Amino acid sequence: MQPQLPPLKPIPIKDRISVLYVERGNLDVLDGAFVVVDKTGVRTHLPVGGVACLMLEPGTRVSHAAVTLASRIGCLLVWIGEAGVRLYASGQPGGARADRLLYQAKLALDDSARLKVVRKMYALRFREEPPERRSVEQLRGIEGVRVRKMYELLARQHGVAWKARNYDHTQWESGDVPNRCLSSATACLYGICEAAILAAGYAPAVGFIHTGKPQSFVYDIADIFKFETVVPVAFRIAAKKPRDPEREVRLACRDAFRQSKILHRIIPTIEQVLAAGGMDVPTPPPESVEAVIPNKEGIGDAGHRG
């Protein structure tokens, strides 16, 4: 009998590259390596085990072997439109667990617990406690007013002409540069947030502020980080009026993600906002599978860097 290969040891989300974009190529596993092959047959190796999210643009084909490997190592594959303006589909990298999903759903279905979670999200986003005796709908309205004012403030700070947050994904090129930059920037953030949510074992669709959409929880979590990361980047790039704003935004977002160490913070933030609901995390049954990206346990004592 042939000896079995040792099990893969996925890299923790916090230690990965945030996002890579692939367009006009074939993703495959050749000679044991995850590669993208262009029309001339040239192979480019992708360190997929160290990437949180691969964004697949038009012209990209993916083999069964590539999808299998991405799933095993916990890399989220997202099929998007050109420049990331639409999300068509995403592949779950095997991280969902019944105990986490039931915990999340229980919080979302309990009105009192849901309100506590929403209030915690508000406090983290705006760095102040929300007004007392407000419903989820009222907090959503207050949040919307504050967000519009923050867009206006950032536009003035960067000298960008601003009307409103509005774009038509069916006529992308007709949109103004600030909105195109914002859409490209938030697409980057949504990708890594969804990858983190799945890696932690939760459901992207079960939201608390946002509801009724496949990525409701993604929007909830992304909104906590949006104005400290991608929104300032989008306005800064828009002020330069580049020829290819989408590409400039992607590169700037990658740098912003690295500098802010956002991948270190997303999963702890998810746990923090859910814990605000005041319900105990259920103990997983003995037969439950391990997380697709388990936390690395050190061999030293508590506090040891190893």
Curated annotation (Swiss-Prot):
Keywords: Antiviral defense, DNA-binding, Endonuclease, Hydrolase, Magnesium, Manganese, Metal-binding, Nuclease. GO terms for molecular function: DNA binding; DNA endonuclease activity; endonuclease activity; metal ion binding. Mn(2+) binds at E143, H210, D223. CDD domains: Cas1_I-E. It is an enzyme of class 3 (hydrolase). Its cofactor is Mg(2+); Mn(2+). InterPro entries: Cas1 (IPR050646), Cas1_I-E (IPR033641), CRISPR-assoc_Cas1 (IPR002729), CRISPR-assoc_Cas1_C (IPR042206), CRISPR-assoc_Cas1_ECOLI (IPR019851), CRISPR-assoc_Cas1_N (IPR042211). Signal peptide: none annotated. Its EC number is 3.1.-.-. GO terms for biological process: CRISPR-cas system; defense response to virus; maintenance of CRISPR repeat elements. HAMAP family: Cas1 (MF_01470). CRISPR (clustered regularly interspaced short palindromic repeat), is an adaptive immune system that provides protection against mobile genetic elements (viruses, transposable elements and conjugative plasmids). CRISPR clusters contain spacers, sequences complementary to antecedent mobile elements, and target invading nucleic acids. CRISPR clusters are transcribed and processed into CRISPR RNA (crRNA). Acts as a dsDNA endonuclease. Involved in the integration of spacer DNA into the CRISPR cassette. Belongs to the CRISPR-associated endonuclease Cas1 family. This is CRISPR-associated endonuclease Cas1. It comes from Geobacter sulfurreducens (strain ATCC 51573 / DSM 12127 / PCA). The gene is cas1.
